[in-house]
Amino acid sequence: MIKKVGKRELKVGVKSTRYTPLEDEMQLASMISMQFAGRSVGAYLLRKGSDNFKIKFAFDCIGIHNTLRDEEIDSIFAAVEGGLKDILPGESLTIHLGSFSVDSERQEELSDLYRQVKSTELRYLIMAERSRVRELRNLGIRKPKYLRLYCTYTVDPGSAGASDAIEKVLVRLEKGWKRFVGEYDEARFNQVDGILNSAYTDGFQIWEALLSNKMGLTVRAMTAAEMWQQLWEYFNETQVREIPQLLVLDESGLREEVSSEWNPLTVLMESDFSIPVADRKWVHVKGKYVGVLTFLEKPGGWGDKYKQMLYLWQVISREAIADTEIVCEVARANQDIVKTQMQRVAKQAITAAEISTDHHSVDVMAAINLKRSVAAQESIYEGDVPLYVGVAFLLHRSTTSKLDDACRFFQSLFVSPAWVAREGEYPWKIWLQCLPVTWDNLMAVPFNRRKLYLSGEAPGLLPLVRTKPGDAKGFELISDDGGTPVRVDLYYQHKNLGLFGATRSGKSLLAGNVVTYALAVGLPVVILDYPKPDGTSTFSDYAKFLKHEAAYFDITTEANNIFEIPNLKGLPSSLQKERMDDYIDFLLSALLSMVVGSRRGESTDAAFSDMVRSILGLALKAFFADVLIRDRYAAAYKGGLGSQDWQAMPTLADFIGYCSHERLRMDSIAGDSKGAIERIKLRLRFWVESRVGKALAAPSTFKNDAQLLVFALRGLSNDEDAAQMALSAYSAALRRALASAASIFFIDEAPVLFEFDAISNLIGRLCANGAKSGIRVILSAQDPDTIAKSPASAKIFQNLSTRLVGRIQPAAVDSFATILKYPREVIGRNAAESFFPKRTGMYSQWLIDDSGTFTFARFYPSLPLLAITANNPDEQKARQEAFNRQPDKIRAITELARMLAAN
């Protein structure tokens, strides 16, 4: 552990100047890593003097989401208030919320995707998104936020392990004796080991329980490497250096890892760029000027608990506020001293009132002070705890003039009696106290400028509210309130997605972005698409643009053998059997639909349907157990698409022969069973001979190995044909999905599918059980009505863990409120005229429902993506004209994107 540098005198010419090293203004002695039970917990070790130590733990916190349901508010507020009451005397909790317009993390993620993608077209789209992200950063729209909590554990080494005054004296005597007999170094080592063990059990574990269990916050203890990197980024923009000195405490004991003998604070000052420069109005560090603002007067109060918790969030979430930090430190005040002070104020007020009465006057201020003093004492006696709260606002700007303007605007956001003023004497001192490596409490020295609050008031000054950032990776939206990037990841983890929105809500653009990201990470995507009468659809031009990675099939002109099994040769044998069973289950449902039909609303004999299902199940078992059938499948896959063996692949026509009591090995057959078998044969022969059925019963004419498969369902004459063609497309999609470890199955605008019980049950089963096959389901619809009427609605809605709702029709508000249980005050915003996509700014608006957490967000598409997927008639015409003018499709899309931007 490094000692203080000390002041030095430097003589320049004839003049001598005394300097105080920056290292001595901060008290970081070493970094600590505590490794127990498979966990790595980091901490800063601060030292003041020779025997005073403070250990500071850091937690990364999700925070309290800025959109809460009414029933959540009271419980969350009570949890925060209860946690504040349990802060240990002598310790402090620091809450650090930062909002900066940066994009380095997202750019790195997209850059990694760019490097792993081979397709020129996909690379073009990824680069377009990188450009859009950089544009949003420069405009101050994209503002990632972080929320960190710092908790202290203060210890006097001379009395560590002592619980009362006598034990403390004995510990000090023992220390003196060991120094006398030469055992002090060993004792000192054991003492530090004991201090750090106590810090873990009596400090870290208590704080973690307080934050997560008592206050209900989602926290993660930061590691030593993360804490060092965070400290490094306060002063530098370069690659972080190795930790100079690290104390490691684990089950084997205490050891020190040293990579440099330099003071860790000296290592932080990597260059002149890193060294802070102080002024009476600002601190200059990392090329930015930092202004400091503090509270001079407390807020007058809040209308309700929700507004109280949102008090600071409503300031930092303003669109014009960026590159800003809020640092709040809470420490427990001495309750007895506060009571005495309140009693003194009350006595002074009573005396002032008596004096004014003697002079035949009324002292209104004395009456107010008396009332407030009595109310404060009542609250304390009823269980409130007095707390010292220090709050500082740090604004970062590139020039002093911009900083002056930003500080004036920031001050104007606080309404009287709250008074926020810019620090004009020693901002460097407060800035240092905001760092996690200084000993002094925030705003406690050189003058105690902290405000005294009761535990019921303090939550209004805690910056715990922010927009939850969602997943670590995935496609990205920007929260409407605060500009926080919110990501949805259905690529690296299993998640089903629902997209709801009326026509012109921007669904096509968002769907295109979802699919682009999936293709970039290597996931195969299968889409069931419903084209317009002219044959165009959401994904028709998109598939043409991605020519080598995509295949677009018109299911009415292609043959799709429903009995073609998925090619599972690349999967483990155990997984092959499981997925083959899944496909046979699908075949059973498909055949049942072909035989029974069962359009919703039509009456069916349940007993007869069960009998048909049983017979079909036995027939399928016999069919796939036949060695000759297996050999034909093997030869077909060996020969490949279009070969003679491929044309001999088993089809529906071959299966009909297995629907007999001889094949089923039935010794005797009842009348009902005989009738069911005849019904099965009749219906299946009908499908084999029909126009639609011929496409199902012939060998497939396409190979579904493209990464993006789009099946267009069009030219359907009636609902029954539509159902069977949908089953055909579903079978091809399922084969493609089952042949991959993970895949996406996208059903676009599918109201007709849910009109048929068998098909809706298939989709419901896929939503409920698709996780084991790695299939992520995406459903796109204008409203939830059609899905809700299907028999599988419960399975579907319960497994659509994430839903994105765009602009909806006013008449659809009731559906979302009734079916999806959305609060009307939340979903009502989606029906407003203001929720339509904005041409100015080029974004669409969405409500993200992530497992019941609501976030209003904006989707900012890149202009090339807009040029490719926009599907209103004017945009489609402009796209076709661009392709006609420019044969190079990338140049054509770039030209169209520029034209759209100009308009």
Language model features: what each stretch is:
Residues 1-452:
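Extended, folded cores of ATP/NTP-driven motor/assembly subunits in large transport
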Residues 19-52, 465-503, 510, 689-715:
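The Walker A/P-loop phosphate-binding site
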Residues 55, 147, 524, 707, ...:
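The start of beta-strands in P-loop NTPase/AAA+ ATPase cores
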Residues 60, 64-70, 96-123, 137-140, ...:
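Switch/coupling segment of Walker-type NTPase motor domains
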Residues 61-63, 99, 153-157, 397, ...:
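Short, flexible loop/turn elements at secondary-structure junctions
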Residues 73-88, 333-336, 431-486, 540-546, ...:
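P-loop NTPase motor domains
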Residues 352-354, 482-485, 490-505, 509-517, ...:
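Conserved P-loop NTPase motor cores
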